[in-house]
A protein has these predicted regions:
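C-terminal functional module detector
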Residues: 1-169
Length: 169
């Protein structure tokens, strides 16, 4: 109920603010907030990217790869452990993504359908209130027209198809 969740295909992701606010929580900040990020993986899973999404959007300044920041990534169980500073101009929700763009899950998943998936984990948002008046969403729909009212599964699939998102039948 508190929204303190991660979604993962294997990597174990921990994200919290320097004040200990976890996913689903509300943090207060001035113009920046520090996120403590830790990713652990078994030996057969590799990650090579940490991306912070601000209000659902990626930023090149918050994209950390093994190639651009090699000393930030480990080869043992702990693949990444770092405090990341995020500069903000407005209230925001923050999601951290850990991803293995050069890896798959074949070693652990064998020949199952899931074996070709990439290692990926992300947290539920941490909401950040900058001015102390409560969190205000910015209203960005990320380019998707959001329907109002109830729609059927068929209508939802049609909307996703129009947006270029592939759906299963």
């Amino acid at each position: 109920k508190a929204g303190q969740m991660i979604l993962t295909t294997g990597p174990y992701l921990e994200v919290e603010t320097s004040d200990g606010i976890l996913a689903g929580g509300l943090a207060r900040a001035n113009h920046s907030i520090d996120l403590r990020v830790r990713v652990q993986c078994p030996s057969w899973i590799e990650i090579d990217r940490i991306q912070v999404l601000v209000n659902g959007r990626p930023s090149e300044a918050l994209n950390y790869t093994r190639e651009t920041h090699p000393s930030w990534f480990g080869d043992g169980v702990v693949k990444f452990e770092r405090s990341l500073s995020v500069e903000l101009e407005e209230d925001a929700h923050l999601i951290v993504v850990a991803y293995g763009s050069e890896s798959d899950l074949r070693l652990g998943y064998g020949s199952s359908d899931q074996s070709s998936n990439r290692p990926c984990a992300y947290n539920n948002p941490i909401f950040v209130d900058l001015n102390g008046d409560g969190f205000t969403p910015n209203g960005d729909t990320l380019g998707f027209a959001l329907p109002s009212g109830r729609i059927s599964v068929k209508e939802a699939k049609e909307l996703l198809s129009e947006a270029g998102v592939e759906t299963s039948e």
